[in-house]
């Protein structure tokens, strides 16, 4: 039987007590720390959150791997470099925004910095989106977020607008 691994997410925490929260979930047995980074476009109800500053602030408070799940439409070498410098172990990208050559470059940049790579794919996104990269990634997340509070519709997450 496979062991279930628990990642402690930091999206809805009191950032004034972040170090204490990270210590607490580490001691409670979380296998990963899951941080998010969002721009002002993809995740409208949680704008401009996270990033390398958060990871830099918590790195010394846990020995667990820290993954950074980005909700952005772009990801350049400078961003990856900053994440690597502060001790990020895995970068998780939305497949709908990073397909083909851009994703291949990002995977290579991460590997050169000893980082793992994951992809998220929305519930209604065709699996063909990840066909060419499935063997190059370390993890795949199927995103099934609930009702979008911004408009009250059952759109199953922030990426549904990418497929309209």
Question: Where on the chain are the PLM-derived regions?
Answer:
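Conserved N-terminal beta1-alpha1 strand-loop-helix module at the mouth
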Residues: 1-88, 98-101, 111, 130-138, ...
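Structured N-terminal alpha/beta-domain signature
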Residues: 90-93, 109
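Internal catalytic-core helix/loop-beta-alpha segment
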Residues: 116-121
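A glycine-rich beta-strand to alpha-helix segment
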Residues: 123-126
């Amino acid at each position: 039987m496979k062991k279930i691994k628990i990642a402690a997410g930091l999206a809805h925490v009191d950032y004034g007590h972040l170090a204490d929260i990270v210590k607490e979930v580490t001691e409670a047995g979380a296998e990963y720390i899951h941080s998010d980074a969002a721009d002002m476009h993809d995740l409208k109800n949680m704008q401009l959150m996270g990033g390398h500053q958060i990871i830099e602030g918590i790195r010394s408070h846990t020995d667990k791997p820290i993954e950074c799940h980005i909700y952005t439409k772009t990801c350049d070498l400078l961003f990856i470099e900053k994440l690597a410098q502060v001790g990020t172990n895995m970068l998780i990208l939305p497949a709908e925004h990073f397909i083909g050559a851009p994703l291949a470059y990002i995977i290579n940049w991460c590997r050169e910095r000893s980082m793992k790579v994951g992809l998220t794919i929305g519930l209604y996104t065709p699996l063909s989106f990840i066909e060419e990269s499935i063997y190059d990634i370390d993890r795949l997340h199927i995103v099934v977020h609930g009702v979008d509070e911004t408009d009250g519709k059952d759109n199953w997450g922030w990426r549904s607008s990418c497929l309209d």
